[in-house]
Amino acid sequence: MGLKEDFEEHAEKVKKLTASPSNEDLLILYGLYKQATVGPVTTSRPGMFSMKERAKWDAWKAVEGKSTDEAMSDYITKVKQLLEAEASSASA
């Protein structure tokens, strides 16, 4: 399986987590996903009254400079960590 297919598979797996990841983890995933699928952020930073959009923009901007492959690989790693954490908490 290629990196792109593995990335797409993990993008689907994250939707099936039974426990919602923390906001921090969601923002990390968002930034990596956008960097992997769109590339560098090209829009201006949202205003301070759009806190949710601003946080998402900041998460995307934080991974600026990563290649598509790096972003995909980091995304896969993060999803695997979340899946492992969920599995260990379910068996505890």
UniProtKB/Swiss-Prot annotation:
SUPFAM superfamilies: Acyl-CoA binding protein. An acyl-CoA binds at residues 30-34, 56, 75. Keywords: Lipid-binding, Transport. Coiled coil: none annotated. It comes from the Eukaryota. Residues 3-88 form the ACB domain. One of its GO terms (molecular function) is fatty-acyl-CoA binding. The keyword Membrane does not apply. Pfam families: ACBP (PF00887). InterPro entries: Acyl-CoA-binding_prot_CS, Acyl-CoA-binding_protein, Acyl-CoA-binding_sf, FERM/acyl-CoA-bd_prot_sf. PROSITE patterns: ACB_1, ACB_2. Transmembrane segments: none annotated. The keyword Transport applies. Belongs to the ACBP family. Binds medium- and long-chain acyl-CoA esters with very high affinity and may function as an intracellular carrier of acyl-CoA esters. This is Acyl-CoA-binding protein. It comes from Brassica napus (Rape).
